[in-house]
Every structure is written in C-alpha cells, then in structure tokens.
C-alpha cells in the first residue's frame, strides 16, 4: 500500500493499541475504514510501518512466528453468486432490468476520490466526493440515496448494480440491505478481474470527467458543490447514441424532473456547457 494509506491506517490503529486493544478487536470495529485484511495489519506491524511495535500488542509477543507465505490474496468470498456470469444469467431471467454501473475515480493517490454511479439506459451519471476510498464511504452514499429517494424510487432506479473488484466495493451485503433486511434494495454483481470493458458505459463517461479533472490532478481542494456542477455540465451534454438528447433529458423522460431534483441535478443550457479544467478553476 502507499504511504498515505499506511498513515491513514496508522492513525486508526496506533492510538487504540496504546489503549490496550488487540489488532483483532480494532479490525472488527473498523473493517470498513481499514480496507485491508487483518493479516495485513500484522504484516505492517512486523515491517515497523506504524507508531506501534510487536511489543505493544497485548498477546503477539507470546507466540512463535509462523511460517509466512511470500504473499497473501484478498478474500473474494464477497463475489460468490455475484460474478459477471451470474450477472448475465440474472439479466437472461430478467431482461427488462435497468442496469446501474458503479466505479471510483481517483484523484491524488491517498487523497479525496469520487464514487460514480452511471445509469446505463439514460447515460446519466452521479458523482460523490469522498475523503478516502473506503467501503464505509460507499455504503454511506448508498444509504443517503436511499433516504433522499425513498424506498420505492430507489428500488426502481437500482435493481442491479455492476461494479469492479476494488476493495471499496467488497461489502455487498451492507450495500444490498435496507436497515436490517438483507438483499431488499438492490443486487450487487462484479465484473471479472481486469475486465473494465464489462462496464464500458461507465468508463466512457469517465473520459468526460477527465476532460475537466485530468488524470493525476488532486481533488483535495474540491467540494461536493464543484462535483455536482461538473456533473450538471456532463449530464447536459447531448449524445449521438441518445438521439442527440442529453442524459438529463433522457433520464427526465423515464423518471421525471422531480427525481432529478432530489438527486441534485440541474440542466445547463447547451451554449454554456464547459468540459475543460477551467470550469472548476477558482
């Protein structure tokens, strides 16, 4: 992991270890923020990347070090019955299903990033600024949308969500459940590893974001207001594939203006659309 991520994890775990908590306890309480396996935490402590050492851990010093494999793999249990093949099977059985694609757009590594939500049918895209690329921040946004739209509208807009294997999307059960009832607001599926083309519609729209926020640029000084403004310009941009209508107009035709207002979307007149970095220059 990069230095910023290690600093972020260190900020979470070191104070708690100094209060006498075990890594296991801390991991259970902060799994969504930590974004790594419990084993990785021990590896980082061994490598002396944190403010704490093995001697600080309540029980670690009593144990003889085990044989270490050269590397470990992230648990992909979350993908069971949610693979791309399962997605295609589901669409075969439910051909009328509206598809939503979800992804992240990264700013400066370790800094603020975006969660993007793309409605394939209308090409409308929502984007949300997040302080860190964690699964907790993704779940928070889905909960917020559920609240703003209401259960009925949310269910009709988000029957299925296709996303990639990023660790920020590795808690599907929390994304799918409304309060305590499992699988009752959406169904999460994953693209095959290294197959971004499987959610190509989303990737194409990211090219428009990159016209305004070029790769490598920092999002740290931006606000959600900036991101909403950018998406209003992108969603008002007419597309050939939509019969020369904009995503805003197309989405409005399917779901009505009221839903767009609740999502924070506003139209921008064609002659005022700017898809260059100067749109967000302060």
Question: What annotation goes with each model-predicted range?
Answer:
Residues 1-218, 222-223, 229-232, 237-240, ...:
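Secondary-structure boundary/capping micro-motif
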């Amino acid at each position: 992991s990069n230095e910023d991520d290690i600093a972020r994890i260190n900020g979470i775990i070191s104070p708690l270890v100094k209060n006498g908590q075990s890594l296991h306890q801390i991991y259970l309480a902060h799994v969504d923020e930590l974004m790594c396996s419990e084993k990785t935490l021990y590896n980082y402590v061994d490598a002396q990347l944190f403010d704490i050492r093995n001697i600080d851990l309540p029980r670690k010093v009593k144990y003889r070090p085990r044989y270490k494999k050269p590397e470990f793999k992230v648990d992909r249990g979350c993908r069971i019955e949610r693979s791309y093949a399962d997605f295609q099977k589901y669409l075969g059985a439910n051909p009328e299903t509206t598809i939503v694609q979800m992804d992240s757009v990264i700013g400066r590594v370790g800094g603020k990033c975006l969660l993007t939500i793309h409605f394939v049918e209308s090409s409308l895209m929502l984007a949300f600024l997040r302080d860190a690329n964690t699964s907790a921040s993704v779940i928070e946004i889905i909960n917020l949308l559920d609240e703003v739209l209401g259960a009925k509208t949310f269910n009709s807009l988000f029957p299925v969500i296709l996303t990639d294997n990023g660790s920020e999307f590795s808690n599907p059960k929390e994304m799918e459940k409304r309060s305590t009832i499992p699988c009752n607001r959406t169904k999460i599926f994953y693209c095959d590893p290294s197959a971004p083309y499987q959610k190509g519609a989303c990737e194409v729209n990211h090219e428009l974001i990159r016209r305004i926020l070029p790769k490598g640029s920092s999002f740290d000084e931006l606000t959600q207001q900036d991101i909403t403004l950018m998406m209003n310009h992108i969603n008002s941009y007419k597309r050939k594939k939509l019969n020369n209508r904009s995503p805003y107009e197309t989405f409005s035709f399917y779901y009505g203006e009221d839903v767009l207002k609740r999502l924070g979307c506003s139209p921008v007149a064609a002659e005022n659309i700017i898809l260059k970095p100067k749109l967000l220059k302060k």
